[in-house]
Amino acid sequence: MFYPQEFDVIVVGGGHAGTEAALAAARMGCKTLLLTHNIETLGQMSCNPSIGGIGKGHLVKEVDAMGGAMALATDEGGIQFRILNGSKGPAVRATRAQADRILYKAAIRRMIENQPNLWLFQQAVDDLMVEGDRVVGAVTQVGIKFRARTVVLTAGTFLDGKIHVGLNNYPAGRAGDPPAVSLSARLKELKLPQGRLKTGTPPRIDGRSIDFSKCGVQPGDGMPGGTPGPVPVFSFMGGNVPHPKQVPCWITHTNERTHDIIRSGFDRSPMFTGKIDGVGPRYCPSVEDKINRFAGKDSHQIFLEPEGLTTHEIYPNGISTSLPFDIQYALVRSMAGMENAHILRPGYAIEYDYFDPRALKTNFETRAIGGLFFAGQINGTTGYEEAAAQGMFAGINAALQCQEKEAWLPKRDEAYLGVLVDDLITKGVTEPYRMFTSRAEFRLMLREDNADMRLTEKGRELGLVDDARWDAFNRKRDIVSRETQRLRALWINPNNLPASEAERVLGKAIEREYNLADLLRRPDVNYAGLMSLDGGRYANPEIPTGNEDVSRETSTDSALPADLVKSVIEQIEITAKYAGYIDLQKVEVERASHYENLKLPADLDYLQVSALSFEARQMLSKHRPETLGLASRIQGITPATISLLLVHLKKNLWKNTTPLKSAEAEA
C-alpha cells in the first residue's frame, strides 16, 4: 500500500548519520520521515562507547555549531571527558568523552521525538522507488510504500552485512540485528559502483571479573588525579547540561604470551584465511593485524572503558578481533588484571557493502539517481563522528533541494566537514576513511574552539540554529570583539609601569609603549596575567580572571556564565597569539581559491581535449568534477594538467565569458 502522507525527505537508518540527517532536514522545515528497523536502537553506539578524539572531536564541534545533536547528547551521557593534546597548539587539541550508552541513546531519542516536522516509523527498507532517473520513495519489508521528493540512505554496516567469528560467519547488520540484503541487491541493480569493507569490535568483559588493582588508572579531566580544572563540555551550549557521575578508565597491556596466543589462531582467522574480502580500517586495526604488522613490538596498550553507570560491562579498547572464541578467551585472560575475566559478548568482524563516494555530486547526491543521497559508512568512512557530520551535510542538502535552493558545500578552509566531503568525492576510498587533523592543510584556522565562529552563522542562515543558540553565539562573539578592540586601544607606557610588575607578568621590563593586544601575543603572557598588571587597573569587570576557579557554575563576580568567560578568554588569547600564522594561512587560502570554485562545463568532452594526456582525459571523463578545484584533487591530475585544461577552456569555451573574467579579476 501507499502510505497516505507524502514527505519531503525520507531518511533510511537511525544511526549517527541518520539521526543527524533527519534532525537537520526537519529543522529546516521539511516534512521528514525517519525509517529505522528498530526504534529502540536510535543513536546506538554499535562499537566503542566514546565520542571525539583528534580530528573527530573537531567534526563533533562543527556539527554542534550548526545545531546538531551529537555533542549535546555526549554532554548528557558523558561519564569521562578529556582534552587530548592539551599541552600542544590549539589546532590539534581535541575533546574526547566516554559515554554511557544508555544515557546517550536516550538523549538522541528524546531529541528525535521532540523535533517538529519529524516522523518516525519502524520498518526495515527493502527497496527504493525509482521513476526514470530519480528516486521517489522507499518500500519497507512488508510492502508499505512511502513517497518523498528525496531519500537519504544511511545504512551503516547493514548492507549485505556478514559477521565473522573465526571460520564461522552469518548474515547480520551488527550483533543482534539482521542485514539489509534486499536493499543491497537493489542498489547493485542501479549500477552504482560498490565494494566491500570491514570493521570489527572487541569482546566485552564483565568488570566484576577484572582485578583493577593490577591495572593503571586513567582519570578524566576535572577528576581526582586528572588534569585540574572543570570537567570539559563538548557542546557550545553544554554549560547548561549537567554531566552525569564521572568515572575513570583503566589500562592494561598485551604481552609476549598474549601475542603467542594470537599467532596460534592465525590459521583460523578469517582475515588470514581469505574468508573476509573487505578491507579494514588502517588506524583501528584488529589485534591480530597489529601483532602481524608490528611483530617486533612486545606489548600494546589496552584501555578498559566502562560502558555505562548502570552496567558492569567493560569495552577493552585495543583488542578488536575476529579470532575464534577459544583464542579470544585465552588472549583476554593472558593480560594483567584479566586472569579471571568473564567475556559477556564475543568480539567479531563485520564486512559490508559500501559505494564509491566518487560517484556522488558535491552535495552527496548520487550522480546516477537524482534525489538519492548517501551518508555515513555507505560512503566508505568509519566512525560515529564522520557519520554524524556526513548525515547532517546530506540532510541539509536534501532539504535545500526540496526548497529548490542551491546546495551547500563548506570549503576546505572553512570546516573539517569540507575536508571530509572533498576527500571522499575526489579521492574515494580504498580502506575505511577516518578524520585526522593532518588531513586539513588549513588546520590552524579549523580549531575546535572556533567551530561556532566559523559555522553558526551559516547554520542560522540555513534554518538549523534555534534562538537560544543564536543568542548565546552573538553574546560570545560580541564580547570577544569588544574585548579585542579594548586591548588594542589600551596602551602601557614603561614610565607608568613598575619594572617589578612588568617582570612578574611579562618576564622583563618593557622599553617602549605597547598596547595590551601586542603584549598578549607573547608566548608566555596570558590574559589573566595581563589583567592583573598594576593591581588590576586594566581588568575588564565583565570578564573575571585572576586565581578564581572558572567552574561551570555562574561566576559570582559577573553576569556571564563562567563557561562563557572561559571560552571568551580562550578565543581572545588564541586569536592574539596566532594572528600572524593565521594571516599567512589566509594568504595561502586566497592564492588557492582563485580558480577553486570555477565551474567546469557539465557537457565538456574531456576525451577531445588533445593537449591532455590520455590518462588525464580518462580520469576527468570518469569523475566529471564540477569545479577546477575538485579536478585538481583527482588522483593522477597534476598541476600541469590543470594549466593545460585552463588554456583549453580560455581558448575554446570561456572566451569573453563571466567565469574567466571573474577568475582573472580574483587572480
From Swiss-Prot:
Keywords: Cytoplasm, FAD, Flavoprotein, NAD, tRNA processing. It comes from the Bacteria. Signal peptide: none annotated. NAD(+) binds at residues 280-294. The keyword NAD applies. The keyword Cell division does not apply. Its main location: cytoplasm. InterPro entries: FAD/NAD-bd_sf, GIDA_C_N, MnmG, MnmG-rel, MnmG-rel_CS, MnmG_C, MnmG_C_subdom, MnmG_C_subdom_sf. FAD binds at residues 13-18. One of its GO terms (cellular component) is cytosol. Its cofactor is FAD. Pfam families: GIDA, GIDA_C_1st, SAM_GIDA_C. It is found in: Cytoplasm. GO terms for molecular function: flavin adenine dinucleotide binding. GO terms for biological process: tRNA methylation; tRNA wobble uridine modification. SMART domains: GIDA_assoc_3. NAD-binding protein involved in the addition of a carboxymethylaminomethyl (cmnm) group at the wobble position (U34) of certain tRNAs, forming tRNA-cmnm(5)s(2)U34. PANTHER family: GLUCOSE INHIBITED DIVISION PROTEIN A (PTHR11806), PROTEIN MTO1 HOMOLOG, MITOCHONDRIAL (PTHR11806:SF0). HAMAP family: MnmG_GidA (MF_00129). Homodimer. Heterotetramer of two MnmE and two MnmG subunits. Belongs to the MnmG family. This is tRNA uridine 5-carboxymethylaminomethyl modification enzyme MnmG. It comes from Polaromonas naphthalenivorans (strain CJ2). The gene is mnmG.
